[in-house]
């Protein structure tokens, strides 16, 4: 699938690191380093805009290594980029770790996953069909 991109000066295309990668790395495009303090959040620009085919979305997801090693994650994960959005992609990062985290220009800060997006027809109904689970949620199926 082709995804057309527009890059600001200095921005880099998303990059898959292996042939089996589902996520392509997104990089920060910043003039000066950003220090993300514990529990602080910041919107990090990428310098990237995309033109997605209708029926496709781009999901912005955390990088597992940043989450494990530093507590850095995408706050609104997965962030959804709709097919009709043409603005610059930015990544809302939060530091859930205990130490300051430094973000520099070109750092890989998140990953982009391309997915199908289906628009449903929502219809109102007085009663929904019964299931074994019913209305149980939030741990109702147990832990083990």
UniProtKB/Swiss-Prot annotation:
Pathway: Pyrimidine metabolism; dUMP biosynthesis; dUMP from dCTP (dUTP route): step 2/2. GO terms for molecular function: dUTP diphosphatase activity; magnesium ion binding. It catalyses: dUTP + H2O = dUMP + diphosphate + H(+). Gene3D superfamilies: 2.70.40.10. One of its GO terms (biological process) is dUMP biosynthetic process. Its EC number is 3.6.1.23. Substrate binds at residues 63-65, 76, 80-82. Its cofactor is Mg(2+). Keywords: Hydrolase, Magnesium, Metal-binding, Nucleotide metabolism. Signal peptide: none annotated. NCBIfam families: dut, PRK00601.1. Belongs to the dUTPase family. This enzyme is involved in nucleotide metabolism: it produces dUMP, the immediate precursor of thymidine nucleotides and it decreases the intracellular concentration of dUTP so that uracil cannot be incorporated into DNA. This is Deoxyuridine 5'-triphosphate nucleotidohydrolase. The gene is dut.
């Amino acid at each position: 699938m082709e995804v057309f991109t527009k890059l600001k000066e200095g921005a880099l295309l998303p990059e898959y690191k292996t042939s089996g990668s589902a996520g392509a790395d997104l990089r920060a495009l910043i003039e000066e380093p950003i220090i993300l303090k514990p529990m602080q959040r910041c919107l990090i620009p990428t310098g990237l805009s995309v033109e997605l085919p209708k029926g496709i979305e781009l999901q912005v997801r955390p990088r597992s290594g940043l989450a494990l090693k530093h507590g850095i994650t995408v706050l609104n994960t997965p962030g959804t980029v709709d097919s009709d959005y043409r603005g610059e992609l930015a990544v809302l990062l939060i530091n859930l770790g205990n130490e300051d985290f430094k973000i520099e220009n070109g750092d890989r800060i998140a990953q982009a996953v391309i997915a199908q997006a289906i628009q449903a027809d929502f219809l109102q109904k007085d009663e929904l069909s019964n299931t074994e689970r019913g209305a149980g949620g939030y741990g109702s199926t147990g832990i083990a």
